[in-house]
Every structure is written in structure tokens, then in C-alpha cells.
């Protein structure tokens, strides 16, 4: 192989392509120790800003665009593409080429129903038994399907944070899609009014924020050190980011108007777990303004949050 002839010369070969399970398996088996793998997720907001005439400037506009049109390169760079037609082709290719040929996923119809059901439960704690019951399939089948979606970067499972917090913590992950546009396509959301006023509005904005967080880590070559928290006595924190043994707490709210009420979960967490090393908390919202809400919690714009993530590493 050419790569073996001059091992001292690094970075001579760059291979790109969509997620091909078989190709990745062969590469890691034959080139172990000789390759670096970069995971390229759908475009982040920061990447979309480099596209001329992207049509979005504020956090509100980027959320609308990401939800209704998605973040895959083709639909972002070429706005004339019918995104619904593109998603239909994307799913057909993904199902028929990448999955049917490589995995025994069983009924394609059941798997498509599973995708739609999972999309309707984005930003929720993953309950495989409930999904299996609703679909009439075995729990192990759902586990297998989830693993496939995770391996192909369709979904991201956000683990719970329960280190040193005792046993009364929810320990199942929450499920997020790495492209919010795919969620909207799967559940049939096609216009702004239904997006912002429908029952999934808050979940979709949370999905948008978590997916942007995951992309920020991956785009810097880092594995996300991110979590959520839910206790059995009702305390919930949407996002915890850990760095150098310090926790940063975030609540995600689909609103442009913030109040002190939104600071209560973060302040309660600080009181309950005062021995932990906790940084200042933040509320991420559709507002483009940044200011202090309380001594321990600030309002942080999406733009400010993304800048903070860039500096974070």
C-alpha cells in the first residue's frame, strides 16, 4: 500500500463520503493506527453563516430555518431544492442501501413507523419498552434500531448526569435527532405557525439547541461531555456541560421573554449539590439579548452560547 511506503509523511490521503458502515468497518480493520476519522454532522449555525444569502440572522430565524428546511449541505447551499422531496430520497437511500443491505432490520415498514414515533418523542427520556409496545415489536428490536440510528449519527443519546448524586436519578438517556429538519419531516410539520404553536414547539427548540451543542464539540474534534439531569423529586436540568471537573448548567426555553421563574431549577440544583464545582448557570432562549437574571444565572443568547462553546475547548 502507498501509505506503508512512506509512513513518515502524514496527511497525504483524504477520503470523504457519506456514512458507509461497511467501508468504515474495513478501514478500521486494515488501517488501525494509521488513520484519523473526522465525523462531519449536518451543518451547524456557524457553518450556515458562511453560506451567502442564507436568509437567517437571528437565533429565531436560524431555529425556524433549521427546523423547517434542515441542516444537510444540499438543502442549505441550494435553497431551490424541495426539502421534502430531498428528505424522502434521503430516507429511501438510507433505508434501502445502508440498512437493508447491511443489517437485518426486519420489516422496513415497522422501521419507518419506528422513525416517525421516535421523532415525535425527541427531547424525551428514551423508553424502549413503551416504543416496543406501541409498535408491537420486541424490546430487543427497538434496542437494535436505536443502536443503528446512533451509529449512523441520525440520533444522539444524551446521558444522564448522576455521578455522586445518589440513586434517585433518572438513568435512561434522552434522545435527540442531529438534524431538526428531519424531525419535522417525519412528524409532518411544514410551516412556521404549526412549528411555533404546536405541541412539539418546545421539544423542537430543545432538540435544536442540543444538536448545535453536539456539532460544536464534534467540529472541534472533541467528544461531547454533556448530560441532562432529572431527579425523582422533580428537579430537571436540560443540559449540563462538564469541563475540568466543573459543571455548567443550562435551561432551554422557547421564548423571547425571560423571567426569574426560569432560574429556579438551576438555583435549586446548586443548593442540593453545593459540594460540586458549579459554574454560573444560563438560560438559552430565542432572545438575542444577554443579561443577568439572578446572582447565579444569566440570560444567554444562542449566538453568545455558540461563541462560548467555541472558546470552551
PLM feature spans:
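Conserved catalytic/switch belt of AAA+ P-loop NTPases
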Residues: 1-15, 25-29
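Short, polar loop motifs at secondary-structure junctions
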Residues: 20-22, 283-290
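Accessory nucleic acid-recognition modules appended to NTPase machines
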Residues: 80-247
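Arginine/glycine-rich "motif VI" loop of SF2 helicases in the C-terminal RecA-like domain
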Residues: 218-219, 268-278
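Mg2+/Mn2+-dependent nuclease catalytic core
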Residues: 255-272
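Domain-level recognition of nuclease-like catalytic cores that cleave nucleotide substrates
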Residues: 286-313
Amino acid at each position: 500500500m502507498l501509505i506503508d511506503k512512506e509512513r513518515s509523511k502524514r496527511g497525504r490521503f483524504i477520503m470523504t463520503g457519506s456514512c458507509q458502515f461497511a467501508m468504515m468497518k474495513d478501514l478500521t480493520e486494515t488501517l488501525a493506527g494509521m488513520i484519523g476519522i473526522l465525523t462531519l454532522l449536518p451543518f451547524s449555525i456557524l457553518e450556515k453563516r458562511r453560506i451567502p444569502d442564507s436568509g437567517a440572522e437571528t437565533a429565531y430565524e436560524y431555529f425556524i430555518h433549521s427546523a423547517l428546511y434542515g441542516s444537510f449541505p444540499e438543502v442549505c447551499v441550494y435553497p431551490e431544492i424541495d426539502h421534502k422531496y430531498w428528505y424522502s430520497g434521503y430516507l429511501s437511500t438510507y433505508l434501502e442501501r445502508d440498512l437493508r443491505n447491511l443489517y437485518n432490520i426486519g420489516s422496513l415498514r415497522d422501521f419507518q413507523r419506528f422513525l416517525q414515533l421516535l421523532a415525535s418523542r425527541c427531547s424525551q427520556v428514551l423508553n424502549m419498552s413503551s416504543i416496543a409496545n406501541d409498535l408491537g415489536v420486541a424490546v430487543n428490536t427497538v434496542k437494535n434500531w436505536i443502536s443503528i440510528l446512533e451509529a449512523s449519527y441520525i440520533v444522539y443519546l444524551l446521558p444522564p448526569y448522576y455521578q455522586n448524586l445518589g440513586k434517585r436519578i433518572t438513568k435512561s438517556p434522552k434522545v435527540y435527532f442531529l438534524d431538526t429538519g428531519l424531525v419535522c419531516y417525519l412528524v409532518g410539520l411544514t410551516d412556521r405557525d404549526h412549528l411555533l404553536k404546536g405541541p412539539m414547539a418546545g421539544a423542537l427548540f430543545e432538540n435544536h439547541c442540543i444538536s448545535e451543542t453536539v456539532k460544536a464539540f464534534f467540529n472541534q474534534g472533541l467528544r461531547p461531555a454533556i448530560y441532562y439531569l432529572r431527579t425523582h423529586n422533580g428537579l430537571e436540568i436540560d443540559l449540563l456541560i462538564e469541563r475540568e471537573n466543573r459543571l455548567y448548567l443550562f435551561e432551554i426555553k422557547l421564548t423571547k421573554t425571560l423571567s426569574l421563574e426560569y432560574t429556579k431549577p438551576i438555583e435549586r440544583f446548586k443548593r442540593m449539590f453545593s459540594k460540586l464545582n458549579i459554574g454560573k448557570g444560563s438560560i438559552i432562549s430565542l432572545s438575542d439579548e444577554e443579561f443577568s437574571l439572578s446572582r447565579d444565572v444569566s440570560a444567554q443568547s444562542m449566538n453568545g452560547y455558540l461563541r462560548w462553546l467555541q472558546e470552551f475547548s
